[in-house]
């Protein structure tokens, strides 16, 4: 007896089931799910896989997204504790790890998360040996280094979300002050994602007009308008949001989807993301810090050589030394 499906549909060919644009998100906490929904709403993948260790939560999140399929353009959403569900991913986004507690610095999380990465990364590599890895878990610069070491991937394929969000926060606050949309407010925050990030005051502009040229005191202590406060707010903003709602999610999710779009669509846009920076700015160790990078289908193909003031360069170097001090003690 022919089934209803057979009566309705005449099959012409057996299709091979390898996805062309698959994205995996590891970790379905607040950040992972914000990444997932942002990616789904930008139509970046033909398959989305979710992985976590908490099976009930994982299945619930998957079902909840699947029930929205009518309103999305991603035909397959899968999940599992076993990494076989991640096979053939183009991009794997790692958000899993211990969460930052109120008042806790990102660097404090480090050894807890290294141990988690020792399990995750080899499993990802096993099933998607040609993927790009996008690291979001904190402290992101150190964990990007850890993922690079464990994976054995070339450095172009291991990317940290880095200062993409810090720069977005900076441009939002700049826009609020000037009454201009953040897209038209240009400014870069580089270095460590977190407390020692470096705002590049010389690069701040609207429509190519340098703010530093108009206002030479910009970013200095003697600035009457105290633009330094804008960067201070960027540094404090995550702590404030965590204090108020317990975690951050939406902005980082949108920021990650922005990076995923450049990678999946080979856009070659420039983003401040964490990459291996050894040999630049007098840095001699294997550290990952954010500099402006061209992102496309191969991950980071190029980076932009930013001219820094001696003070900015010294701050970057100091960040690198701090990170290396922690990295060289890590057990993995």
UniProtKB/Swiss-Prot annotation:
PROSITE patterns: L_LDH. The modification N6-acetyllysine is found at residues 5, 14, 57, 81, 118, 126, 224, 232, 243, 318. The keyword Cytoplasm applies. Its EC number is 1.1.1.27. NAD(+) binds at residues 29-57, 99, 138. The modification N-acetylalanine is found at residue 2. GO terms for molecular function: L-lactate dehydrogenase activity. The active site is at 193 (proton acceptor). The modification Phosphotyrosine is found at residue 239. The modification N6-succinyllysine is found at residues 5, 118, 318. GO terms for cellular component: cytoplasm. Substrate binds at residues 106, 138, 169, 248. It catalyses: (S)-lactate + NAD(+) = pyruvate + NADH + H(+). It comes from the Eukaryota. The modification Phosphothreonine is found at residues 18, 309, 322. Signal peptide: none annotated. Its main location: cytoplasm. Keywords: Acetylation, Cytoplasm, Isopeptide bond, NAD, Oxidoreductase, Phosphoprotein, Ubl conjugation. Interconverts simultaneously and stereospecifically pyruvate and lactate with concomitant interconversion of NADH and NAD(+). Belongs to the LDH/MDH superfamily. LDH family. PANTHER family: L-2-HYDROXYCARBOXYLATE DEHYDROGENASE (NAD(P)(+)) (PTHR43128), L-LACTATE DEHYDROGENASE A CHAIN (PTHR43128:SF10). Homotetramer. Interacts with PTEN upstream reading frame protein MP31. HAMAP family: Lactate_dehydrog (MF_00488). This is L-lactate dehydrogenase A chain. It comes from Macaca fascicularis (Crab-eating macaque).
């Amino acid at each position: 007896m022919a089934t209803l499906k057979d009566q309705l549909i005449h099959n012409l060919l057996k299709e091979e089931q390898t996805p062309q644009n698959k994205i995996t998100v590891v970790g379905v906490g607040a950040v992972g799910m914000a990444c997932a929904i942002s990616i789904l709403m930008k139509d970046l993948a033909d398959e989305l896989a979710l992985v976590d260790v908490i099976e009930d939560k994982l299945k619930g999140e998957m079902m909840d997204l699947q029930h929205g399929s009518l309103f999305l353009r991603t035909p397959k959403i899968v999940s599992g504790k076993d990494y076989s569900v991640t096979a053939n991913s183009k991009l794997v986004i790692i958000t899993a790890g211990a969460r930052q507690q109120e008042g806790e610095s990102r660097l404090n999380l480090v050894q807890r998360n290294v141990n988690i990465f020792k399990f995750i990364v080899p499993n990802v590599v096993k099933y998607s040996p040609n993927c790009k890895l996008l690291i979001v878990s904190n402290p992101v610069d150190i964990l990007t280094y850890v993922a690079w070491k464990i994976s054995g991937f070339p450095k172009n394929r291991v990317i940290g979300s880095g200062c993409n969000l810090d720069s977005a926060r900076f441009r939002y606050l700049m826009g609020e002050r000037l009454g201009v949309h953040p897209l038209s407010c240009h400014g870069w925050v580089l270095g460590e994602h977190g407390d020692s990030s470096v705002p590049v005051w010389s690069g701040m502009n609207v429509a190519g007009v340098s703010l530093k040229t108009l206002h030479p005191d910009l970013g200095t202590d003697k600035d009457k308008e105290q633009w330094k406060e804008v960067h201070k707010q960027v540094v404090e903003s995550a702590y404030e949001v965590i204090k108020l709602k317990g975690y951050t999610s939406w902005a980082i999710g949108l920021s990650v989807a922005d990076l995923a779009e450049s990678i999946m669509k080979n856009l070659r846009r420039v983003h401040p993301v964490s990459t291996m920076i050894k040999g630049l700015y007098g840095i001699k160790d294997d550290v990952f810090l954010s500099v402006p990078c061209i992102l496309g289908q191969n991950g980071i193909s190029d980076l932009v050589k930013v001219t820094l003031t001696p003070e900015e360069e010294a701050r970057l170097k100091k960040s690198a030394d701090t990170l290396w001090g922690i990295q060289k003690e890590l057990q993995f």
